[in-house]
Amino acid sequence: MAPILDDSIALEKKQEIQKKFGGVFQGLWFEEEICFAIAGGGCKAFYGLGFGHEMKSWGLKFREVSGVSAGAAMVLCLICGDEEECVSFFENIVRKNPANFYLSRLFKGERVFPHEEMYRKTIRFGMDFQKIVKSGIKVFIHTLKAIPKEDSLRNKFRLARLIAETAKAFLEDERDKKRGLNTGRMQRVLRKWNMKEVLFTEKDFDDEKAVEQIILNSSSVPPVVSVQSHGNEYYFDGGLTNNLLLEVFPPDKKTIGVYYEPTTIVGKDPKLLERCYLQTPSEPLPITSFDYTDPNGVRRAYELGKRDARLNKDKIFEYLKKDWAKAAFFLKSK
């Protein structure tokens, strides 16, 4: 006599077969290996982490990734596969942090901003060096390296003044971009710094400390995150010149990018933007870049990223259709 199968067992087997068949079918019609970029933005980058996490659950694989500032930490977190744990860890340390600025520390000679220490702790918690190396995924992290031309800038007071001037120029340029005006302040300041763009890749990941330092190099936003320096070289947030690194990916590969502000893509090549799928939050993000006191905002930004990915799943898969599949659909519809 044939064994009697419980209905639930039969249903599970059917679903398993459908899932396997669906995976094969998906691989035939869609590009499953993609390039993925997350813009910098401090806590806002948790939105990008949530978006990437949701796409991974569909079976999409990252062939190449790029990140700037906090976006760099997020793309590496996606490679390590511990997104949920990292969000929970950061929520917990943020919950214990009552303020973004501690004046009392100033008189003790300590850092008045808690951000850098909390940032480093989260990076150390979430980074699995062996997973990153063994993944085979190409990684690009954008930063700025400066070697001041003027010897006088070795004076700490003058160096601090130039740092303040850099921050002011960036904020004023962002304001003008929102108004649709041409900007040039940052370029003038960068010339004083003798600044050039630097791309770190997975080939620069010698060990865990190197990975951590590269992320910090890309995230240097004084005074919140101190200027990272090595000898006479200074590193600044890569977002000062390019906060969404799309240009490094092969033009024939499907590329998805996440950013948060309209000014991020101002000045980018229109042809580059046309061949990418770009995503911004569907509603105002519930947290600001440097608010390290709001665990609920962190979680909500992450969950909004996941939700927006789900809401746009059909659009994303339409973008990921292979060229022959699009052609077949076009011929069928004629």
Spell out what each predicted region is:
Residues 1-65, 77-334:
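Patatin-like phospholipase
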